[in-house]
Amino acid sequence: MAVSDHRLQSVILDDESLAAVSRDQEQERQIAIFDLLEENHFAPAGSERGPYGLKISLIDGRLALDITGPSYERRHLLSLSPFRGVLKDYRMICESYYDAIRNATPQKIEALDMGRRGLHNEGSALLQQRLAEKVELDVDTARRLFTLICALQWRG
């Protein structure tokens, strides 16, 4: 089994779960999917090999990860409660960051970007922790997946 077998080859965000977003947020969503598919490590527990497809949706206020692969099909549901604080803070700082890009000084933009990255790291580490028994992810994969989870939470 090659290490590259444990990877995502497709990612779908459930249309019914998606919130209306700004152009900046939509662009970030598309970049995250592109980057995720270009390079990732995604190894579901109990699966011998990939590659895998992933559909991300919200079901009754929980995050649903539908994973399919050769001889593998499973849905993992995660409570969003542990993510609420970091999602709220991340959304607020992103909104400030997008506003700052248009109007603020480079120093203000840099400060907001540092805060945004810090919260993004916190959210992706929490995602890795919550999925630890279900799916093994590398740091970059967790970061890109966290971006997509945020996309489901943003309310334009």
Give the residues covered by each predicted segment.
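Charge-rich, low-complexity N-terminal segments
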Residues: 1-51
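A signal for specific C-terminal beta-sheet/loop modules enriched in small/flexible residues
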Residues: 2, 6-7, 28-38, 75-95, ...
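Acidic-enriched, low-complexity/disordered segments with a strong bias for Aspartate over Glutamate
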Residues: 5, 14-15, 24, 35, ...
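Short, exposed beta-strand/loop patches in secreted or surface proteins that constitute
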Residues: 54-58
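Negatively charged, Asp/Glu-rich surface segments that serve as flexible interaction/assembly modules
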Residues: 59-127
